[in-house]
Design a protein with these regions (language model features):
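Bacterial N-terminal signal peptides that target proteins for export
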Residues: 2-13
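Generic anion/oxyanion-binding catalytic loop in active/binding sites
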Residues: 17, 42, 87, 190, ...
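Bacterial Sec-dependent signal peptides at the C-terminal "C-region" and cleavage site
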Residues: 20-30
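Acidic, Gly/Ser/Thr-rich repeat motifs that build Ca2+-stabilized beta-propeller blades
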Residues: 28-177, 236-256
């Protein structure tokens, strides 16, 4: 019986793998060349800083523009929806995310986040409303992140709905500093503290009230709407309807972006 070295056997195995792989790669290349080209159609190129969108039905899309307009696209027809909101359109602010209610067929509610301005300060605010005659009506403010700060970035703002039908909303840390000596304190403290909404995921009932099973409800000094904390600028959130999990995307300063599962 002949004895073969480990190196010899390894080379033979490697050669067999190559023989098996090359045809597969060629087939994959052929399939992609013939079937993997994306098909797309440009619906409109008349948008100004689009930020969020919601499919109202199979043909209508409602789009938020940070510059302050809502646009309803039906096929190629664009209608402007009047909002009259006091929007801080500067930096990363403006009209932000928009989602339709999980019960939209019954209540026709739409949920919108925007950078609300007051006395030169701003914050992330959440409203819900209906649309009638190309304007928003029945407007209710459901939430505003506290405190207001003198910053025009890191609003977060993304919306989704969890398995139980709660609304989840992201709020950024707002990059809130006024002097160089405070930078370290702000980055280490604010998103980690439970007495403010900065750098948090917020969990609400659809009417803006606080769910009774929120994790920090009843904790001394904690704001009851907080669901998770310690975020920088979470500008993506997704509910996987297959397994019920919720994920957020948290932007890093120069790389270091994170995808976090909320548990």
């Amino acid at each position: 019986m002949r004895n073969y070295s480990i190196e010899y056997v390894s080379n033979i195995i490697f050669f067999i793998i190559i023989l098996l792989t090359v045809p597969s790669l060629s087939l994959a290349k052929y399939l992609c060349e013939s079937d993997c080209e994306p098909n797309y159609e440009i619906i409109t190129n008349d948008l100004n800083y689009p930020w969020g969108f919601a499919f109202l039905d199979e043909t209508r899309i409602l789009i938020s523009e940070r510059s302050g307009l809502l646009k309803l696209i039906d096929g190629k027809l664009i209608q402007n929806i009047e909002t009259r909101l006091q929007v801080n359109f500067s930096g990363q602010g403006g009209l932000l995310d928009i989602k339709k209610s999980p019960n939209y067929d019954q209540d026709k509610y739409l949920y919108l986040t925007y950078s609300k301005i007051k006395k030169g300060l701003s914050t992330t605010a959440l409203i819900r409303f209906n649309i009638e005659s190309n304007r928003i009506v029945n407007v209710e403010e459901l939430f505003e992140a506290l405190p207001y700060v003198r910053s025009n970035i890191h609003y977060g703002s993304r919306i989704t709905f969890d398995e139980a039908g709660h609304l989840l909303l992201t709020v950024g840390d707002r990059f809130n500093y006024t002097t160089a000596s405070r930078i370290a304190d702000v980055f280490k403290a604010d998103p980690q503290r439970l007495d403010n909404h900065l750098g948090k995921t917020i969990r609400l009932n659809l009417d803006g009230t606080t769910p009774k099973d929120n994790p920090f409800l009843g904790l001394a000094g904690a704001l009851p709407e907080i669901f998770t904390y310690g975020h920088r600028n979470p500008q993506g959130i997704y509910h996987n309807s297959v397994d019920g999990q919720v994920y957020i995307v948290d932007h890093g300063p120069k790389g270091g972006d994170e995808i976090n599962q909320l548990v």
